[in-house]
């Protein structure tokens, strides 16, 4: 919930017109990924609070004792404990929607060829699940829990590698502008970030380390794998955002006067 709070705060700070944020919630547009995202965020937050309250007495007894001193708080915690399983199950569809909607939002932005891929939404979802599993491995206290989520993350990393390959193939088999967009990570300005920080450091090395950990060959570097997965998750999003914003359907340098472009750059504050 703390990470969700940080994310929602940064989203709010990024808004150009912060006073009008309420307008997201005056209507719901079925065909708008932005509308879906706004409503998903507002629904996920209270459900996640209920999920925390369902285990607060077992996980945070000191905090639970403070909540129990207030009658409504005690009643709410009792209710959450009674319906813990139902609350946990209700979180799943909203969590999946939260993980996938960013990629869907970007892929719907047809003006940017690098984003215009049907694989992007699933890639963001699987990457988010992988980084979540890695975070659990880092903070879990029980060995059995660490081992379980290491195995889950191993499967997710393999799925992520397959999705990355599909995205690259999709761009390579697309229009000329999609191929040009692909060049940004195939020898272009984002090649290093994509292939070194994301693919190698964020996927391949953790994959190898987790295989060695599960097989019992080497456990000395086991805790390095989830850290690298988190680095890779960030690198993926940074590269996708930067490369996508630079990709375009119009080749300005060849279709417009170079003198006019130079003058526009000089006048740009």
Positions of predicted regions on the chain:
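Alpha-helical transmembrane segments
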Residues: 1-4, 92-94
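Membrane-water interface signatures at transmembrane helix termini and the short loops
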Residues: 135, 235-237, 243
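Long, contiguous internal "core" modules enriched in hydrophobic/ aromatic residues
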Residues: 47-218, 223-225, 231-233
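Transmembrane-helix bundle segments that line or gate the permeation/cavity pathway
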Residues: 2-19, 37-62
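The feature captures the catalytic groove of carbohydrate-active enzymes
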Residues: 23-27, 34-40, 123-136
């Amino acid at each position: 919930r703390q990470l969700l709070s940080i994310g929602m705060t940064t989203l709010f700070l990024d808004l150009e017109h912060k006073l009008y944020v309420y307008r997201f919630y005056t209507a719901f547009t079925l065909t708008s990924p932005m509308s879906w995202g706004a409503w998903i965020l507002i629904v996920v937050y209270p459900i996640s609070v209920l999920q925390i309250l369902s285990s607060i007495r077992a996980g945070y007894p000191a905090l639970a004792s403070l909540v129990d001193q207030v009658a409504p708080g005690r009643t709410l915690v009792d209710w959450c404990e009674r319906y813990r399983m139902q609350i946990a199950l209700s979180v799943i569809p909203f969590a999946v929607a939260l993980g996938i909607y960013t990629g869907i939002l970007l892929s719907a932005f047809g003006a940017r060829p690098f984003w215009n891929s049907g694989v992007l939404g699933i890639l963001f979802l699987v990457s988010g699940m992988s980084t979540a599993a890695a975070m659990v491995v880092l903070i879990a206290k029980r060995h059995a829990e660490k081992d379980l989520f290491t195995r889950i993350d191993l499967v997710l990393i393999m799925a992520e590698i397959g999705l990355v390959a599909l995205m690259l193939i999709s761009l390579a088999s697309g229009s000329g502008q999609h191929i040009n967009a692909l060049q940004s990570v195939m020898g272009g300005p984002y090649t290093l970030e994509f292939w070194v920080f994301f693919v190698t450091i964020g996927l391949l090395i953790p994959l190898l380390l987790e295989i060695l950990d599960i097989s019992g060959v080497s456990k000395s570097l086991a805790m390095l794998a989830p850290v690298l997965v988190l680095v890779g998750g960030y690198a993926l999003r940074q590269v996708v955002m930067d490369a996508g914003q630079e990709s375009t359907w119009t080749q300005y340098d060849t279709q417009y006067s170079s003198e006019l472009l130079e003058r526009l750059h000089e006048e740009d504050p």
